Structure formats: C-alpha cells, structure tokens
C-alpha cells in the first residue's frame, strides 16, 4: 500500500539496511541510489550517505552509528531544501551517540527546526490511523515539563497543529 501512496526513500547505509532486512527477515528489496532524484517509483530506495563501515549491533549504542545518523539526517535535509523530497519522516535516534561538536541538540526534532525552520517552530506529531497527538514540549527532562509549559507555548503549538491538520491532513 505504501508504494501506491508515495516513493519512499531511506537515507543511510545500504549495508546497514541490508543487515536489518536480513536480521528481521523482511521480504523487502530496495534500490541503492546516490540521490532521491534517482529513486524508482513503486520501489523502496536507499540513498547511500556513507561509505564507512558502520558496525551494527541491536541495542548497543555506537558513536559511529551516531555519526552515520547525523550524516543521513543532513543529506535528507539537503535534498528537502533542493525540492527532491516533500517530507522527512524520522526514526528514533540514540540522543547520546549523535552528540558532537556540530550536533549539540536535545534531539533531531530541534536540529531539523534549527536547520529548516527559518525562525518557525516545529511540532512533534504522533499518529495512528485517524488519531493524532501533538506534543507541547520536546526533548526535555520530566522534571522540567511543568515549568516549561506556558499559555503562550500552548497557543503557539495549537496554531501550528491547527494549520497542520488543515494543510497536511485535510481536516
């Protein structure tokens, strides 16, 4: 069904994608491309973002994996800016391994906001079928949530959520 709705492009390492496909016994095939412009319709494509050997061990954080995740995110942002892709959907990242001199953000949502926001604020939306939840706060410790929520922040997030529901979801 997904291939009928869009042309999915994964940014990362084809070797890592193949490892996960094999480990999880997924019947999915993909094309390896250098840019989303080369992505084939009706087929999953992987944009090769690194030629480095990335060690993959499930549930074991690795700084090289963090570096690869940042590189993939940066390539997706670049191709979004170029108009090669319409949407960026991210998977969870390890917030500790991605931290570096150039990436000092609590999470990739804040990073994307800084790289693409032009001063606009982001909104994290979780959804399942017809159910959508928007988060008022981002990646902050639980002890800081109450002091971070203000009337102004709630209003700001509601305006963004309302616009997204109309523009992105046709509600």
Where are each of the predicted segments found?
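Contiguous, glycine/small-aliphatic-enriched amphipathic segments in soluble metabolic enzymes
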Residues: 1-108, 149-171
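Flexible loop/hinge segments that line or gate small-molecule binding clefts
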Residues: 103-142
């Amino acid at each position: 069904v997904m291939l009928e709705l869009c042309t999915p492009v994964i940014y990362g390492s084809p070797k890592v994608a193949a490892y996960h496909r094999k480990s999880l016994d997924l019947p999915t095939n993909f094309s390896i491309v250098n840019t989303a412009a080369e992505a084939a319709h009706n087929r999953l494509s992987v944009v090769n973002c690194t030629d480095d050997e990335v060690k993959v061990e499930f549930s074991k954080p690795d700084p090289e994996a963090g570096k690869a995740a940042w590189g993939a995110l940066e390539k997706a942002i670049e191709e979004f800016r170029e108009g090669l892709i319409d949407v960026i959907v991210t998977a969870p990242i390890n917030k500790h391994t991605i931290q570096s001199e150039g990436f000092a953000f609590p999470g990739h949502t804040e990073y994307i906001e800084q790289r693409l926001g032009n001063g606009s604020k982001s909104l994290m939306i979780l959804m399942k079928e017809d159910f959508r939840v928007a988060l008022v706060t981002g990646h902050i410790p639980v002890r800081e949530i109450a002091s971070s929520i203000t009337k102004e922040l709630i209003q700001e997030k509601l305006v963004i959520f309302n616009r997204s529901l109309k523009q992105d979801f046709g509600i």
